[in-house]
């Protein structure tokens, strides 16, 4: 079961990825984690990646694809894997296809931008413990205070409105075109494509994913 999750930041992919991993026993492959692990392990690809990153440059698609191939050849990917955050662009999707990396399911999480902004900018974090609240959906007992310690809550830089809007613009420019790319792939019989309404309750989305994935 090889799965790609598509959707803007804040669309709920992370929450459902945890569920899919637990339910189907497949690992989530994050290219960021993979790069860090390869650099730490000092593999040939890791050394190449380190050299590029140390020079302040972006790692090439070719190198990332090579790392993905290396990663999915490991034992824990025998039953499949879950890709989140990759591919981000059509050239990356093409490179994956050229490298013979097949995908069984592509699942798009559809959520309107304004709801995503609402979801993200309302987050409040207790930095020391990692506890996360939301001013509307999961408020602390006392405004802007952690329930357990009473300490102040903060807003992460990534959760500030201007940052969120920039990330959404980037998503629509680069990643949203993958929706039609994978719809065409599904029409050609190369994968199965599903659109999930991410505006619903977590449990409802989870139930739909179980129906899709079996």
Curated annotation (Swiss-Prot):
Residues bound to ATP: 10-15, 123, 132-133, 200
Stretches the record annotates as NMP: 30-59
Known catalytic reactions: AMP + ATP = 2 ADP
Ranges where the record places region LID: 122-159
Keywords: ATP-binding, Cytoplasm, Kinase, Nucleotide biosynthesis, Nucleotide-binding, Transferase
InterPro entries, A to Z: Adenyl_kin_sub (IPR006259), Adenylat/UMP-CMP_kin (IPR000850), Adenylat_kinase_CS (IPR033690), Adenylate_kinase_lid-dom (IPR007862), P-loop_NTPase (IPR027417)
Any one GO molecular function term: adenylate kinase activity
Location of this chain's protein in the cell: Cytoplasm
GO cellular component, one term: cytoplasm
Binding-site positions, AMP: 31, 36, 57-59, 85-88, 92, 156, 167
Gene Ontology BP terms: AMP salvage
CDD domains attached to this UniProt entry: ADK
EC number: 2.7.4.3
Pfam families: ADK, ADK_lid
Pathway info: Purine metabolism; AMP biosynthesis via salvage pathway; AMP from ADP: step 1/1
Protein family per UniProt: Belongs to the adenylate kinase family.
Known function: Catalyzes the reversible transfer of the terminal phosphate group between ATP and AMP. Plays an important role in cellular energy homeostasis and in adenine nucleotide metabolism.
Record's subunit section: Monomer.
Written domain comment of the UniProt record: Consists of three domains, a large central CORE domain and two small peripheral domains, NMPbind and LID, which undergo movements during catalysis. The LID domain closes over the site of phosphoryl transfer upon ATP binding. Assembling and dissambling the active center during each catalytic cycle provides an effective means to prevent ATP hydrolysis.
PANTHER family, alphabetized: NUCLEOTIDE KINASE
Name the UniProt record assigns to this protein: Adenylate kinase
Organism: Pectobacterium atrosepticum (strain SCRI 1043 / ATCC BAA-672) (Erwinia carotovora subsp. atroseptica)
